[in-house]
Amino acid sequence: MTDPLPYDNPLVTRYAGRPMVELWGPQRKHATWRRLWLALAEAEHELGLTADDGITPRINPEQLAELRAHLDDIDFDRAAEHERRLRHDVMAHIHTLGEVAPLSRSIVHLGATSCYVTDNTDLILMREGLGLVRDRLVGVIDGLARFAEQWKDLPCLGYTHFQPAQLTTVGKRAALWCYDFVLDLHEIEHRIGRLRFRGAKGTTGTQASFLSLFRGDHEKVRKLDQLVARKMGFDEVEPVTGQTYSRKVDTQIVTALAGVCESAHKCGTDLRLLAHEQEIDEPFEAEQVGSSAMAYKRNPMRAERLCSLARFVLGLPAVAAQTAATQWLERTLDDSAARRLVLPQAFLGTDAVLRLLLNVTAGLEVHPAVIARHVGQVLPYMATENLLMAAVAKGGDRQALHEVIRRHSHAATAELKEGASENTLTQRLQTDPAFVGVDVTAALDPARYLGRAPQQVKELLSEVVAPVRSQYAHLLNQSDELAV
């Protein structure tokens, strides 16, 4: 730590991965500004922008070459000096660029407004950030699918209201988590595919400045918009904007990221509950400490952390929506400070959550003996309806048998609540005259109560996960080492 006094953002210093951290860093942001200024100047030159005489090219190749030579050598200290004086970040960087590229000073930002660089840069960074999220999502889906395949046949106790319900399998439960993330992947892919460039729209979105530069040539202004977009890697531009692109786009993207964190929180919470039941544990390092006081503790701290980070991201769509709602007329500056916080942190937080998921799901420890014990405590109750039908088939009285089962069930439950280690309902029914000749043991085979759970896992993997794996084969078998 070089300076322990200033606050640092834990998303950057502890949780998010380096690619996402660098994506939202100052170098990438302002280098993209310079690339946007170059793209605009190139497009204006290619479309024949002329000087006041209507003949001489307004932009020459030497100026463009100079801009290309200074895309990344940004003097941030000098830019900070300019901003303290000008109170305007875009103008500060225009002056900073002009000092190292004096030939090009007069053509930088020609016809543009600040949102030409700020908004278009945000769109570029968000699209790349969505790609990073997509890639990690594929890794999570792949890892959970492998876990579901491995444990698809292991019976476990299902819960509704966190009370014992019917049986499912460990793999089927993982398939539920996996499918949620597949839905998130589709939403992220949709957002990437629908993201448009703001383009060159001018101060209020009318393109008046560019129409003036091109002497009233509407077609050239339209081509300028499209050409700049293509140079920056976009196929489509927003058809209309105010000074900014619609902030609903931000809300849609942040909501998609929150959707990923929503699924992660569900998965993480389930893992924490299962850790309490001692059925599944997250990875635990050889020298990891669970508590400074209680040396025996083994807490699901990674799942807890991912839930904590997920909740943070889940709160951000409301801020994005409020920003979109308060964009007065063509634009206010209400959005600026909030977006500087919300957009990077939504991506950093989501990246951190997915890193944790990759790490946790790659090392889950399943405890079949504990799971079987829990199944054994409840399975006798589940078997009672089958036993009742079997006894009736042998000539028993349905109502009388029902009363026998009720009486023995409550007695066995009372014993468990008083400290008994095993459910005695099976033994009670086996020795009751009312169930003579009924094969009680056969009724206690867990496989009889799984329904189609193993088959459902196979179908999910072959019909839903397999296409994802095929499309993103280069992203399979991911892992991630956490800093803390």
Labelled PLM ranges:
Residues 2-208, 216-229, 290-291, 301-305, ...:
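A helix-coil-helix interface module used to build multimeric assemblies
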Residues 149-171, 280-297, 330-337, 362-382:
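Glycine-rich cofactor-pocket loops
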Residues 226-243:
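A short, charged helix-loop
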Residues 244-279, 288-349:
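A conserved active-site cap/scaffold subdomain adjacent to cofactor or substrate pockets
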Residues 281, 404-411:
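Active/binding-pocket-proximal capping segment
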